[in-house]
């Protein structure tokens, strides 16, 4: 476990999955702590897929592979590359084990960088091969509801950098989406009200096409709790349906689950990223604690 700290925040990161474990301001914990009765993870990195592939199978060049939801990086041990008081970097490289499940060579580095009341999460994906590679990558951080009470309905609310005319798509079958049906996101007064049953019928709120770039999470009294900012083209918002869970996930994605029934090549799936030989994909998202 690596601990980063400054005068405001203390952050913990594990080498297993290069997964964020804790964000504390004083004695207050902001990151969900992984109670398995609700959801046993905290902030997994999703790679080389985001979400599910149809029937847990996908095809590359006519060959079929098996892949579980959200890929394998979250369950692998990363190598520590560098560490200071405010920054740590981990690395995962392709191996015989990964190539048996995902036929593209890769080098994935994940860094956490603390500054003031903010934490940058940095992703670098490199292509060491002489052919194009295709991948998806995403975040899945879970944050405590600050005013959680299982007996009460209200959980606070979200605002976005854009609060009008937002459209979302929904999970339909076997973890895959109906990509053609768009639903208007109801935001009276520019607020997405969070209730204990918000996700019981929809599973995930999924916004595509870079509709939003910032999510602000507010307490019931209207005070700001935290914010996420990002450049990812797809955003997922999720809490376990039917569990009255004490947390919510805000998920920037460079990717998305398959359409229902998709059986094409992996390189042609929705929201896949192509990386040329010797090139590097770079991205960062920022968690800002109020």
What do these predicted ranges mean?
Residues 132-134, 142-145, 149-230:
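Active-site/ligand-binding surface loops and adjacent short beta/alpha elements
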């Amino acid at each position: 476990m690596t601990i980063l700290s400054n005068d405001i925040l203390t952050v913990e990161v594990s080498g297993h999955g290069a997964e964020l474990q804790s964000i504390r301001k004083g004695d207050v914990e902001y990151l969900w702590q992984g109670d398995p009765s609700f959801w046993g993870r905290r902030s997994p990195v999703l790679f080389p897929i985001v979400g599910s592939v149809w029937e847990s199978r996908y095809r590359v060049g006519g060959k079929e592979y098996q892949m579980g939801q959200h890929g394998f990086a979250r369950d692998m041990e990363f190598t520590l590359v560098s560490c200071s008081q405010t920054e740590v970097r981990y690395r995962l490289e392709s191996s015989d084990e990964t190539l048996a499940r995902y036929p593209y060579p890769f080098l994935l580095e994940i860094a956490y960088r603390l500054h003031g009341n903010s934490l940058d999460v940095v992703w670098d994906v490199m292509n060491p091969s002489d052919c194009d590679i295709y991948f998806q990558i995403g975040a899945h951080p879970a944050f405590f509801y600050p005013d959680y009470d299982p007996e009460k309905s209200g959980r606070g609310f979200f605002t976005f950098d854009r609060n009008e005319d937002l459209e979302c798509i929904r999970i339909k079958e076997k973890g895959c989406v109906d990509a053609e049906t768009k639903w208007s996101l109801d935001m009276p007064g520019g607020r997405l009200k969070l209730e204990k049953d918000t996700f019981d019928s929809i599973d995930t709120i999924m916004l595509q096409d870079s509709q939003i770039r910032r999510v602000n999470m507010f307490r019931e009294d209207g005070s700001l709790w935290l914010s996420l900012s990002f450049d990812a083209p797809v955003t997922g918002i999720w809490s376990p349906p039917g569990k009255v869970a004490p947390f919510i996930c805000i998920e920037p994605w460079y990717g998305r689950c398959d359409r229902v029934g998709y059986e094409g090549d992996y390189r042609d799936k929705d929201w896949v990223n192509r990386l040329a030989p010797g090139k590097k994909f770079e991205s960062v998202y920022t968690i800002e604690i109020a």
